[in-house]
């Protein structure tokens, strides 16, 4: 087995993905249900970020943080780069991402609507829509990945 130092000195193997060529986008993922959910979450967080920037700039950090986290998950899933980190429980991380976004956007949306500005009210409406999208995503993750499977012996 080669050490990390030995791997750096060797030239790249023929046919091996080098540099950014290893980041090929899986277009089937982008058109799957999970890909569409991530794209919808990304678009809505960006809209909310713009609304908070126009009205209450104190809340824009929460939307920006969730935008960057969702963008990172979309990038990792679309390029299948997450498979290189096999020690992480990706379904659990994705589930926790959805739960934290639900809590953050519920709190921030209800806090923003108290200002009664037009952009803040729009951020509230988009925030509630986004919370429902995150809740559906969390439900799908739990249902397909995290829910313990029942066997015939467990049902009796």
UniProtKB/Swiss-Prot annotation:
One GO term (biological process): negative regulation of myoblast differentiation
GO molecular function, one term: cytokine activity
Subcellular localization(s) per the UniProt record: Membrane
Transmembrane regions: 35-55, 56-76, 93-113, 119-139
Residue intervals of the MARVEL domain: 29-146
Bilayer disposition of the protein: Multi-pass membrane protein
Keywords from the named record: Chemotaxis, Cytokine, Membrane, Transmembrane, Transmembrane helix
InterPro entries: Marvel, MARVEL-CKLF_proteins
A GO cellular component annotation in the UniProt record: membrane
Family, as annotated: Belongs to the chemokine-like factor family.
Name the record gives this protein: CKLF-like MARVEL transmembrane domain-containing protein 5
